[in-house]
From Swiss-Prot:
Residue ranges that the Swiss-Prot or TrEMBL entry lists as coiled coil: 232-262
UniProt function note: Associates with actin filament appendages that are formed in the inclusion appendages of the parasitophorous vacuole during infection of the host erythrocyte.
Species for this entry: Anaplasma marginale (strain St. Maries)
Molecular function as annotated in GO: actin filament binding
Localisation: Secreted
Protein name: Appendage-associated protein
This protein's UniProt keywords: Coiled coil, Secreted, Signal
One GO term describing the cellular component: symbiont-containing vacuole
GO biological process, one term: biological process involved in interaction with host
Span of the signal peptide: 1-39
Disulfide bridge map: none
Amino acid sequence: MIVTYGTVGCPVSRGGSPGCGRRIAEELRLAEDARLRLALLGRCIVKGSPAQARGELRAELKAIDATIELRKELDAIDAEWAPKIELSAELRAIDAEWRPAIRLRSAYRAIIGRIELRKELDAIDAEWAPKIELSAELKAIDAEWRPAIRLRSAYRAIIGRWELSKELKAIDAEWRPAIARESLRKELDAIDAEWQHAITFWHISRAIIGSIELSKELKAIDAKWKYVAIYERQKAQRRREERAAKAREELRKELNDIDAKWKSASAIKLRKDLRSTSEGVDHTEFALELRATDKSGNMELVLKLKATDTKNQHDAIVKAIEDGFVGYAAECGAATRELNACGGMSTTSAPSTDLISTVVSAVTTGTGQQQSAGSESQRPTECGGGGTLLSSLFALILPSSNWYCNAVLYGGFLGCLGS
């Protein structure tokens, strides 16, 4: 077992004696440690190997050298601090010699302080003596008047409570209607909530009874005015029928007059030609319709041409119709001028008069175009190549709003093509 010891410095006090005591204790400890180390070293030498013993011996020698050096340092410190240690011993002796005098001086100072404090307190008491006496008198007065003061406080409390009670009563009187209204409102709300179903049923029953009574009154009124309403409707119906009959009669008279004027020899000849052409062609039908309405006075002319024999006879039929229209257009123009000169078409406006001349020019132009086209154009199977000419003619005639002019033309067509 190897034990290593290190050097430890000795703390030395600069005051003298405390440091010397610690140094002596340190030396004693070091001597005891050296003795123990030597004893341990002897046991190690006896029990251990020579090499181990030499190592431990070397370590012990180093420790002894360190102890010797420490001893030298401590001796130097002791030599340095020896005068101070001696001075400290002298000062302690002086302190021990003067300690009774120091105690006496401290007691003297305490006595002097108490005497001065007593003087100051006596001066303060002399200054405050009147105030203290006055305070004693006031305390005596307070003790004497304490029952009266208590009575006064109780009286003030009673007066305050009385005034507060008055104010509260005034506030209650002011707010009593509002409080009563609020209470009444709550009671009424509770009653309404309780009787809500009954009130709803009552309203429904009143509504049903009212509707029944109203229905009875309306039925009575209807029964009272029933015949009056029927009479008024019949009267209005008769008036409308009379106006319609009068209008139809007037229209019939005017149309008869127009038919009587326009049944000329040329119209009869054209009609006969068309009939002969129609009779010579099988499966061909012609129809001319004249329709008149009472509301706007417009008249509609419908020319129906149906040709089922499309091989040879169609062109001849269309050509005959176009020739007849060309001749009849000239007749219409002359008749229109004659009527204008005689005043027979005084209600005819200028656009309608221009319409007749436009029809004449359209028929003439269409005929020329058909003749120049010749056999180059392929004609359709129904309504033929004259469909364009006829469509142009009826498009110019039919939309006219002046029924007098249309009646002139329609009467002429009826005279030419009618049965």
